[in-house]
């Protein structure tokens, strides 16, 4: 029956979140998602049994639950990772199942099945929504706004089973207290079901509810109840554990049990949960109306693309976004129409908006399972003002597209392109790929009262492989494709270095190798691969560490070593050192710098701070050490803008995200 009227059920459910439907005489909506980490496979395997049970059972209890519940069912949140893991586990399976944890079956090859195709942790993408899998999932979430969302995971083999709530002191302050109370009440259903089958479990430990970019926490800021399940992992078919032999079927049974207990809780608590969601959005609007300012504005007058990409994220979350009606200067910061956006606070998603834009510096707890800061305009290095007024807002966007670049004006002399635009690297690569010569400005200059900053790209017309007309048409096409403005100039005379000066240096075509494989963090490698491959469309060779000893490194102008983990072998130092001597550019990220320093490729001085506390109780030691870590925080750093690494950044400071305690002393010549 519900399927026959599914549209009207959905419309009524959403109408209630808008305050247009009062009462709880309607179905509850439950989103059940499984195995967003692909190698945590018990969830996805349990989902098939759960789906079968719901489809085949004629039990009165099941039929009553189905009549009162709409279930959004996502059996595999990460099909790429699940496929990698299942292939590995089944390929290495013994006929006589071997529980020895040293067996190859339980030790995946790099990068493992946890991540998706581009090696992203998709359970950190609920807020930024950068991946295609996430975008479809988030669209479904906002189209339905479920009352409960479950997120089925696995944890260490020697654990048991976890369900939320998590550690109380690590719940985000914007999450309502009632949310956690309802989570705990739902937990009694899980406890009862697991008691019945004799499975051990725990709650209110290990995990937190702070970062809203995770599947179990994202619902909490959207009027839903997010619930994390963590099952001890067999990481294959059968494995020894501190609790005895752990089999894959046992892990599946626990996940299935939690899935069923969720539906039972939803059915019995239906009226409570529907009323909670109604009140959540009603309270949101009341809080938004009490704000002393009515809007938020953000943007960057020098880079419309970065501003657009933040607006794009907001709109994927069904947040209303307006254009800026005209150029504005607020608190000394310039906001340009077409490169800035206005967000009204008076909308039902105000709590989510606040979570995205707030800067929080005080916390109840100093320990975090995940990051503690994610202010989105800071992540994009944008100017923003949370105390703006809706009077500066123009029309609301129904759909949003990346701003169109200005037309290229024809020049018989030269063309200039700013390096501040997000897509400038993509445009430059298009130019160099066509074997067109380009140079980079090492100093600022001015032409006809227009200022050009460090890093401006110069494309001279003379001595190119295209005629003047063909070059103009080509650059016009590049500008339209990349949305980067390219300007023609008629003279090389400037205030500053003239265009023929040695302060313009030739840019060579990059040929990039990205080191991947054992000893490299898949997350960091995947982030770089994704950026170059999908955003900038710059070819990149993924060079496995196992190939380094025999690969012809002379093919590459640039080698990137992402963050290392574990032991990154010193055996590769000699060929890389010789390659650097021959003019190669080596880029090392985070603790790859230690490898660079250790192998004398570059002298790096690391700053260390020793812990001087004494008298730490044994039970406190783990938390004491954990409190010294940086799980993810935002810092402001001073920049020396004349350094090529900082070209394209308009200010002499920048906001950076840190998730490590690696600190490097300033260069002695700085």
Feature annotation, model-predicted:
Residues 1-41, 50-69, 118, 124-125, ...:
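Intrinsic-disorder/low-complexity accessory segments
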Residues 46-47:
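Active/ligand-binding-proximal structured segments within catalytic/core domains
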Residues 51-54, 68-91, 96:
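Carboxylate/His-rich catalytic cores and anion/metal-binding grooves
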Residues 75-80, 89, 152-160, 592-593:
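Short, solvent-exposed turn/loop segments enriched in Gly/Ser/Thr/Pro and often Arg
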Residues 88-106, 127, 131-134, 146, ...:
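Active-site cavity-forming subdomains of large catalytic enzyme subunits
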Residues 101-120:
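Aromatic- and acidic-residue-enriched carbohydrate-binding clefts of CAZyme catalytic domains
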Residues 151-152, 561:
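Conserved beta-strand positions
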């Amino acid at each position: 029956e519900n399927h026959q009227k599914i549209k009207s059920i959905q419309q009524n459910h959403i109408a209630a979140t808008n305050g247009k439907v009062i009462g709880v005489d309607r179905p509850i909506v439950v989103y059940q998602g499984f195995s967003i980490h692909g190698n945590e496979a018990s969830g996805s395997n349990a989902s098939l049994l759960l789906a079968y049970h719901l489809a085949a059972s004629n039990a009165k209890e099941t039929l009553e639950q189905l009549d009162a519940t709409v279930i959004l069912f996502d059996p595999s949140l990460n099909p790429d990772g699940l496929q990698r893991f299942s292939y590995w586990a089944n390929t290495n399976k013994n006929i006589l199942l071997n529980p020895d944890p040293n067996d190859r079956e339980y030790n995946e090859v790099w990068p493992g099945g946890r991540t998706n195709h581009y090696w992203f942790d998709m359970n950190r993408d609920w807020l930024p929504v950068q991946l295609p899998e996430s975008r479809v999932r988030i669209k479904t979430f906002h189209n339905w706004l479920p009352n409960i969302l479950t997120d089925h995971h696995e944890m260490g083999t020697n654990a048991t089973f976890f369900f939320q709530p998590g550690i109380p002191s690590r719940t985000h302050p914007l999450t309502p207290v009632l949310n956690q109370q309802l989570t705990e009440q739902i937990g009694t259903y899980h406890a009862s079901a697991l008691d019945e089958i004799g499975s051990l479990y725990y709650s209110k430990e290990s995990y937190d509810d702070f970062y809203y970019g995770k599947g179990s926490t994202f619902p909490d800021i959207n009027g839903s109840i997010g619930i994390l399940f963590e099952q001890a992992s067999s990481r294959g078919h059968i494995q020894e554990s501190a609790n005895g032999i752990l089999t894959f079927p046992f892990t599946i049974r626990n996940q299935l049990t939690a899935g069923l207990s969720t539906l039972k809780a939803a059915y019995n608590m239906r009226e409570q949960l529907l009323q909670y969601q109604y009140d959540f959005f009603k309270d949101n609007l009341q809080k938004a109306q009490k704000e002393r300012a009515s809007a938020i504005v953000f943007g960057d007058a020098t880079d419309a693309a970065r501003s657009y990409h933040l607006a794009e994220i907001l709109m994927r979350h069904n947040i209303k976004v307006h254009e800026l009606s005209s150029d504005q200067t607020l608190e000394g910061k310039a906001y340009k129409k077409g490169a800035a956006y206005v967000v009204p606070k008076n909308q039902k998603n105000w709590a989510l908006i606040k979570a995205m834009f707030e800067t929080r510096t005080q916390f109840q707890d100093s320990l975090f399972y995940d990051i503690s800061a994610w202010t989105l305009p800071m992540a994009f290095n944008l100017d923003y003002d949370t105390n703006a007024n809706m009077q500066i807002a123009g029309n609301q966007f129904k759909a949003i597209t990346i701003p169109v670049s200005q037309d290229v004006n024809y020049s018989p002399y030269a063309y200039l392109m700013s390096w501040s635009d997000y897509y400038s690297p993509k445009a430059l690569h298009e130019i160099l790929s066509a074997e067109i010569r380009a140079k980079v400005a090492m100093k600022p200059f001015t032409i006809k009262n227009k200022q050009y900053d460090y890093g401006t790209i110069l494309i001279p017309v003379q001595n190119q492989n295209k005629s003047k007309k063909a070059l103009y048409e080509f650059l016009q096409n590049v500008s339209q494709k990349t949305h980067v403005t390219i300007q023609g100039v008629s003279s090389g005379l400037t205030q500053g270095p003239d265009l023929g000066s040695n302060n313009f240096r030739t840019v060579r075509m990059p040929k990039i190798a990205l080191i991947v494989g054992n000893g490299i963090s898949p997350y960091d490698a995947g982030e770089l691969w994704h950026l170059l491959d999908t955003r900038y469309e710059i070819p990149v060779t993924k060079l496995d560490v196992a190939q380094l000893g025999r690969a012809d490194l002379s093919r590459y102008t640039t080698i990137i070593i992402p963050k290392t983990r574990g032991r990154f072998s010193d055996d590769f130092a000699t060929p890389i050192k010789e390659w650097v001597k021959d003019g190669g550019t080596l880029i090392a990220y985070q603790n790859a710098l230690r490898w660079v320093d250790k192998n004398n490729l570059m002298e790096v001085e690391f700053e260390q701070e020793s812990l001087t506390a004494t008298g730490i109780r044994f039970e406190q030691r783990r938390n004491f050490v954990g409190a010294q870590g940086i799980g993810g925080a935002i810092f402001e750093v001073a920049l020396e803008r004349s350094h090529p690494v900082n070209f394209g950044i308009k200010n002499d400071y920048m906001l950076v995200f840190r998730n490590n305690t690696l600190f490097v002393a300033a260069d002695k010549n700085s």
